[in-house]
Each structure stands twice: as structure tokens, then as C-alpha cells.
């Protein structure tokens, strides 16, 4: 009985560890994820900095740092019409949140806060 409980505990621990891993590829993507992706900062109701550059063809981790007390997210779209989403991050009231973005083809992409549509930026995949 002790062996069964020990085995069950180990399987449960392994499942929890796998579920919490930030290196998993997003749905519809395969391959490794670059954990050293860009950081996007929300401060004073805008995104800080200029265009964000990423390596084309590689899944990457987008590090979001919400320094406002207002809720924000980072939603990546193919263009400024925001009609075709590439990755939609979780809304964060304050603090940091990582999201994995599937590999982008070379080109320019649009991102915004889906809560505050006037908060926008550009991602360039090279």
C-alpha cells in the first residue's frame, strides 16, 4: 500500500511540475521556447520603449511587467486591425507575467492592451 501511495505521489508531483513549466510551446506550436525573449513594460497607461525585436521562426517568452495599478495585458496581432490574434496574454492588475508566443514569420506585428486599446506597440520579427 505504501508503494502505491508513493508511486501516486510521484506521478502527481511530475504532472504538477510539467503543468507549471514556462518552457512549453504554445498551442499549435512545436519545438523549444527561447526563455530570453523581450520584456514589455506598461507604465503610466502606455507601453514603454520603441519597437520590440524578436528572432523569426523561434517560439519565445514575452515578459510582461505591469507597473501600473490598472489592469493590462499584451495581445499580439498580425496587424493594427487586431482581427487576427497571434497571442493574447492574461490580464494582470500589477506585477509580472510571462507568456509564450509561437514562432513568428519575418515581418512587423502589432500589439496592444486589450483593456486599453490606445496602448499599442510593434514587434518586428527578423
PLM feature segments, named:
Residues 2-9, 13-16, 20-126:
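Extracytoplasmic copper-binding redox domains, predominantly the cupredoxin/blue-copper superfamily
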Amino acid at each position: 500500500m505504501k508503494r502505491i501511495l508513493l508511486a501516486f505521489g510521484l506521478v502527481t508531483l511530475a504532472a504538477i511540475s510539467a503543468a507549471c513549466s514556462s518552457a512549453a510551446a504554445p498551442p499549435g506550436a512545436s519545438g523549444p521556447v527561447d526563455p530570453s525573449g523581450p520584456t514589455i513594460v506598461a507604465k503610466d497607461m502606455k507601453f514603454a520603449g520603441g519597437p520590440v525585436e524578436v528572432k523569426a521562426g523561434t517560439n519565445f517568452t514575452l515578459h510582461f511587467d505591469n507597473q501600473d495599478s490598472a489592469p493590462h495585458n499584451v495581445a499580439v496581432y498580425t496587424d493594427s486591425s487586431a482581427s487576427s490574434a497571434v497571442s493574447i496574454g492574461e490580464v494582470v492588475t500589477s506585477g509580472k507575467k510571462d507568456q509564450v508566443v509561437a514562432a513568428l514569420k519575418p515581418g512587423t506585428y502589432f500589439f496592444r492592451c486589450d483593456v486599453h486599446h490606445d496602448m499599442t506597440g510593434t514587434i518586428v520579427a527578423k
